[in-house]
Curated annotation (Swiss-Prot):
This is Interferon alpha-H. It is found in: Secreted. Disulfide bonds join C24-C122, C52-C162. One of its GO terms (cellular component) is extracellular space. GO terms for biological process: adaptive immune response; B cell activation involved in immune response; defense response to virus; humoral immune response; natural killer cell activation involved in immune response; positive regulation of biosynthetic process; response to exogenous dsRNA; T cell activation involved in immune response. Belongs to the alpha/beta interferon family. GO terms for molecular function: cytokine activity; type I interferon receptor binding. Its main location: secreted. Keywords: Antiviral defense, Cytokine, Disulfide bond, Secreted, Signal. Produced by macrophages, IFN-alpha have antiviral activities. Interferon stimulates the production of two enzymes: a protein kinase and an oligoadenylate synthetase.
Length: 189
């Protein structure tokens, strides 16, 4: 009887360890892939930003969604997921395929897809712990509206190279802000 209990206890401890290792220590696990996305976005640049100054636009990036002092780690994961998901969708359009080097674009989408998978696992875990959706509707809506403005801008500019350059720079700004958010949580941990 004792060996059976020992075996069950060992199995329980191993499964707890496996589950906890899937635990979302996002600031530690997400930062490196996020930097990879930033690197790929930099490499996508085809047009000099200085030649596109007349095309710049204020898209009203929802900084409060990523930088609010009241933002909890679980909500931050949701915001990061939302930003990553919309970025993936933006760079998966037909217009993006025409604007960028296909090989780099494939690498970017693969990196974003991996981030989405990791973030989704974190979201499921956090929602399981809390039993409720993590992202406040206003933060989610702010991120969606921001990416909608980017999409409308591209359509208005007929997906020209400068418009894509402006959008690429905007997305880099969003990912830089999310990296800063992760650093803030890393310092807290």
């Amino acid at each position: 009887m004792a060996p059976a209990w020992s075996f069950l206890l060992a199995l329980l401890l191993l499964s707890c360890n496996a589950i906890c290792s899937l635990g979302c220590h996002l600031p530690h696990t997400h930062s490196l892939p996020n930097r990879r996305v930033l690197t790929l976005l930099r490499q996508l640049r085809r047009v000099s930003p200085s030649s596109c100054l007349q095309d710049r636009n204020d898209f009203a990036f929802p900084q409060e969604a990523l930088g609010g002092s009241q933002l909890q780690k679980a909500q931050a994961i949701s915001v990061l997921h939302e930003v990553t998901q919309h970025t993936f969708q933006l760079f998966s359009t037909e217009g993006s395929a025409a604007a960028w080097d296909e090989s780099l674009l494939d690498k970017l989408r693969a990196a974003l897809d991996q981030q989405l998978t990791d973030l989704q696992a974190c979201l499921r875990q956090e929602e399981g712990l809390r039993g409720a959706p993590l992202l406040k509707e206003d933060a989610s809506l702010a991120v969606r509206k921001y990416f909608h403005r980017l999409t409308l801008y591209l359509r208005e500019k007929r997906h020209n190279p400068c418009a894509w350059e402006v959008v690429r720079a905007e997305v880099m700004r969003a990912f830089s802000s999310s990296t800063n958010l992760q650093e803030r949580f890393r310092r807290k941990d």
